[in-house]
Regions:
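Sec-exported extracytoplasmic/periplasmic mature domains
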Residues: 49-56, 98-104, 154, 167-175
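Beta-strand elements of well-folded, non-transmembrane domains
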Residues: 37, 88-90, 100, 111-115, ...
Length: 187
């Protein structure tokens, strides 16, 4: 009986320690990556704001090209949405919430499975002497306690994926000779 009591006290102490550590960890995260692309923003922006273009460069889509994608609304406009269902990439959606043409995009990303999560997907396009500085940021809140523990690893798990996405976007943008269709094109 005494051994069970000791094991119970140790287990309770570990749970308490876990909860205390989680309580002092950050309640939000922010991952930001930047790349210089040697082309004007007018060539890059449509590849990001028009959600049907994401599968051409998105690193998450590369992980599961057979995932089912659905696009709703006029591409490149506020309210346009991309939803996906896959065994590897899970189930989620992205909705465009704010745009400043060739300068800024803010979207809401919602993961339903495997782990529910809501985040802001932010894009900045800044003109430079040789092209455009593109900054991709994802930020959101972390639930207590497990989300905060997971947040410790978010940068190391996701940072390289963002870098790959920006490298794909850079390659695709610099290979184009004509800007992709924008939401205002009727072609």
């Amino acid at each position: 009986m005494r051994i069970l009591k000791i094991i119970g006290m140790i287990a309770g102490g570990l749970v308490a320690l876990f909860l205390i550590v989680a309580a002092v960890l950050p309640s939000s995260y922010r991952i930001t990556r930047t790349v210089e692309i040697e082309t004007p923003a007018e060539m890059i922006y449509p590849l990001v704001v028009n959600l049907p273009n994401w599968p051409k460069w998105d690193p998450f889509t590369e992980q599961e090209p057979t995932a089912k994608s659905t696009f709703v609304g006029e591409p490149g406009t506020i309210g346009s949405e991309w939803s996906w269902v896959g065994e590897v990439i899970g189930t989620g959606s992205m909705t465009v919430e704010e745009v400043v043409p060739n300068r800024y995009i803010r979207s809401r990303m919602e993961m339903i499975a495997p782990q529910p999560m809501v985040a802001q997907d932010l894009w900045d396009f800044t003109p430079t002497a040789s092209g455009t500085k593109v900054t991709w940021t994802v930020q959101g809140d972390l639930d207590y306690p497990m989300g905060r523990i997971f947040g410790l690893f978010m940068e190391s798990l996701m940072g390289s994926t963002f870098e790959k996405g920006l490298a794909n976007l850079k390659r695709l943008s610099e290979q184009q000779t004509v800007a992709p269709l924008s939401s205002n094109d009727s072609r």
